[in-house]
A protein has these predicted regions:
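ATP/NTP phosphate-donor binding region
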Residues: 1-65, 72, 77, 81
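Short glycine-rich anion-binding loops that position phosphate/pyrophosphate groups of nucleotides
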Residues: 14, 67-70, 76, 92-95, ...
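Short glycine-/acidic-enriched loop or helix-start segments at secondary-structure transitions
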Residues: 19, 73-76, 98-101, 205-206, ...
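Glycine-rich phosphate/pyrophosphate-binding beta-alpha loops
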Residues: 132, 136, 195-209, 274
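Short acidic/glycine-rich loop or secondary-structure boundary segments that cap or lie
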Residues: 136-139, 188-190, 202-205, 229-232
């Protein structure tokens, strides 16, 4: 039987170079599986997108070596290019929540996944996992900036992330005042977290949306109303085992379409990356999500 051909895109920016270090092991596993491997290490997000589209026309099997954001960018480009082959994820990022869902949903299911779409003004993006406002954006921004300037601190990412949660809350950088319009109701208030997701895990392993399903045509919308720092930390700790839903500050809804209207312009994080447009980080007053 002839070897199957696979094209692999490697994102060297994932987790400060973790994908590059992990690739030799993945390459050995693929070679042992009798794959003929063509790999390419990208130089930028633009280069990654260009080669994802190019690979869509060259290969029936495409591998992505990187984190959640690498996978969702690839899915976006491959979907646009009409790719109907097999997508293989080789997880090597700082955030691998999508992998946790893949492992958890190993039971035979329909092969078609729903992609989410988020739009704000003229900017839109397809995604596999989730979009969130509030705490996740603030922590992403602080941790990313610190590790970019001091990459030697990467082994302490967990501690840095916890401190970022504390400072974000104390400085009110997590605060999002919003109206959330769902299929059948509208939620309003001050929130620390607004999450619209089709995967169960968030924030590097928290079981935040236990009923989310990317085979279903609806988002699971999870919100945490702003509360004390101690209560917020208790909620996040409880989310390890999905017990956060027992707190009155936490609400869970399902909706196929979601509109988030903000009192003041704010950024959104989509599958681990803050959404950007040609001018840089996008800050909108209204975001729409649909499947």
């Amino acid at each position: 039987m002839p070897a199957r051909k696979i094209g692999v895109l490697i994102n060297p920016a994932s987790a400060g170079g973790r994908a590059v270090k992990a690739w030799p092991e993945f390459e050995s596993l693929l070679a042992a599986g009798d794959f003929e491997i063509v790999s390419y290490t990208t130089s930028s997000e633009t280069d990654f997108r260009v080669h994802a589209r190019a690979f869509a026309g060259r290969f029936d099997i495409i591998g992505i070596c990187g984190g959640d954001s690498s996978l969702t960018i690839a899915a976006e480009e491959l979907f646009s290019a009409g790719f109907d082959g097999e997508l293989v994820f080789l997880p090597a990022g700082s955030v691998n929540d999508i992998v946790l869902d893949i492992r958890e949903q190993r039971a035979p299911r329909a092969s078609t996944l729903w992609l989410g779409e988020i739009s704000a003004g003229a900017t839109s993006k397809d995604f596999i996992g989730q979009a969130n406002w509030g705490l996740g954006v603030a922590v992403n921004r602080q941790v990313g900036a610190l590790l970019h300037s001091m990459p030697f601190l990467r082994p302490f990412t967990g501690i840095i992330g916890f401190l970022a949660i504390v400072f974000s809350h104390l400085l009110r950088r997590d605060l999002v005042s919003a109206s959330i319009h769902l299929d059948s109701e509208t939620l309003e208030g001050d929130y620390s977290i607004i999450l619209a997701t089709q995967i169960r895990h968030w924030a590097s392993g928290l079981r935040f949306a236990p009923q989310a399903d990317w085979y279903a045509p609806v988002f699971e919308v999870v919100t945490i109303r702003r509360c004390s720092l101690v209560k917020l930390i208790r909620i996040l700790l409880a989310a390890r085992t999905a017990r956060h839903v027992d707190f009155p500050e936490v609400e869970v809804h399902q909706s196929r379409r979601v509109k988030v209207s903000l009192a003041s312009a704010a950024a959104v994080q989509v599958d681990g990356d803050i959404l950007r447009d040609v001018a840089g980080e996008l800050k909108g007053l209204e975001y729409r999500l649909a499947k």
